[in-house]
Amino acid sequence: MSHFYDLAPKDKDGNPFPFSNLKGKVVLVVNTASKCGFTPQYKGLEALYQKYKDRGFIILGFPCNQFGNQEPGSDEEIAQFCQKNYGVTFPVLAKINVNGDNVDPVYQFLKSQKKQLGLERIKWNFEKFLVNRQGQVIERYSSISKPEHLENDIESVL
């Protein structure tokens, strides 16, 4: 993949979700899990989404079960959990791998664009990548970075 907009992961129903439809938007990509100590970040992520969605901002959640088996459910169960417990309205796509031999092309691309502490691999759930309106990865945040602490960076690219 040579560009963010060439990517087309699957949505929770198994249909393509072409990133070409995101051209001109600011995108926050997050690998998520329902049974993680960071799971309450869904609330903050949804607050960010509600605050900025009308200004061309979108969050994409990518469930992943690679860290402590903290996302064991089906795509439908995950979507229901997010909506019921955190009122999530931003897209939560199909479960993927973010590391290893079967890494999803989305994360292969993101990690190649922005390393963290000199490493490409994702260390845990709820790492975040901020992508500007031109499809460039401009920032990567660790799991401990709370969504509300990303506001200045988001504002700067909206």
Swiss-Prot record:
Give the catalytic activity: a hydroperoxide + [thioredoxin]-dithiol = an alcohol + [thioredoxin]-disulfide + H2O
Q: What class of enzyme is it?
A: oxidoreductase
Q: Write out the GO MF terms.
A: thioredoxin peroxidase activity; thioredoxin-dependent peroxiredoxin activity
BP-aspect Gene Ontology terms? cell redox homeostasis; cellular detoxification of hydrogen peroxide; cellular response to oxidative stress; hydrogen peroxide catabolic process
E.C. code: 1.11.1.24
Among InterPro entries, the record links this protein to:
Glutathione_peroxidase, GPX_AS, GPX_CS, Thioredoxin-like_sf
Q: Does the keyword Kinase apply?
A: no
Q: Name one GO cellular component term.
A: mitochondrion
- Induction conditions: By oxidative, osmo- and heat stress.
Q: Which cystines does this chain contain?
A: 36-82
The listed locations are: Cytoplasm; Mitochondrion
Which controlled-vocabulary keywords does the entry list? Antioxidant, Cytoplasm, Disulfide bond, Mitochondrion, Oxidoreductase, Peroxidase, Redox-active center, Stress response
Q: How does it assemble?
A: Monomer.
Write out the function statement from the record.
Glutathione peroxidase-like protein that protects cells during oxidative stress. Has peroxidase activity reducing hydrogen peroxide, alkyl and phospholipid hydroperoxides using preferentially thioredoxin as a reducing power. May act as a scavenger of H(2)O(2).
This one is known as Glutathione peroxidase-like peroxiredoxin gpx1
